[in-house]
Design a protein with these regions (language model features):
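Membrane-embedded alpha-helical bundles that constitute the cytochrome b-like, heme-associated redox core
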Residues: 1-168
Length: 168
C-alpha cells in the first residue's frame, strides 16, 4: 500500500497516543499526513476485533440466518461452538461501537481542529502542512494491491479448505 497505509506509518507507542490525545484536547496543533498516534492505535484495535470476528465466525452457529454455521463448526464440540457464538455476537457489538467512535472522531477532528480528514481519505490528497510523520505520501502500485488482495483471499479460502471446512 501507500506509505501512509503501512503498519510502520501508524504504529506508535501507547504513551505517544496518550500524549497526542492530551494535545488534541488542549488544541495544540500537531499534523500528520497519515493516521495520528491515537487514530493509529484505534486502527490496530479495529484490525484485532475484525480478526477475532473472522476467527470466531469460523466456529459460530446462527440459526437466525440462512448461513447457519461457520465452515469449521463440525470440527469442534457443541460447547466450543456455543462459546464461539456468544463471543462472536458480543464482539460484533463492540466492533460497531469502536467503528462509530472512529467515525465520530473524524467529525470531531473537523469541528475541533477545523481539519478535513474524510475528504483526503476519499481523494487521496491532503493540503500540504508540516507533517510530523512524513513529508509526502508515496503511492503504491494498484496492480500490486490487487495481487495482494487475491493472495490474501487464496490464503483464507485455502486455509478453510485444508481444515476441512465447507465454503459456500
Amino acid at each position: 500500500g501507500s506509505s501512509t497505509s503501512r503498519f510502520s506509518a501508524f504504529a506508535y507507542a501507547p504513551w505517544t497516543a496518550i500524549r497526542y490525545g492530551i494535545d488534541f484536547l488542549l488544541r495544540r496543533p500537531r499534523h500528520f499526513l497519515g493516521h495520528n498516534p491515537l487514530g493509529g492505535t484505534v486502527v490496530f484495535i479495529l484490525l484485532g476485533l475484525v480478526a477475532a470476528q473472522g476467527l470466531l465466525g469460523l466456529f459460530s452457529y446462527d440459526d437466525h440466518t440462512d448461513l447457519h454455521g461457520g465452515p469449521l463448526t463440525s470440527k469442534v464440540s457443541e460447547a466450543t461452538v456455543a462459546l464461539a457464538t456468544r463471543w462472536h455476537i458480543w464482539l460484533f457489538d463492540i466492533l460497531l461501537i469502536v467503528i462509530a467512535l472512529h467515525i465520530l472522531a473524524s467529525f470531531a477532528y473537523a469541528i475541533w481542529k477545523r481539519e478535513d480528514l474524510i475528504g483526503p481519505m476519499i481523494t487521496g490528497r491532503k493540503r500540504r502542512k508540516d507533517f510530523e510523520d512524513q513529508p509526502e505520501a508515496q503511492i503504491a502500485s494498484p496492480l500490486m494491491a490487487l495481487l495482494c488482495l487475491i493472495l490474501a483471499a487464496a490464503i483464507v479460502l485455502g486455509g478453510i479448505t485444508l481444515a476441512g471446512g465447507k465454503i459456500g
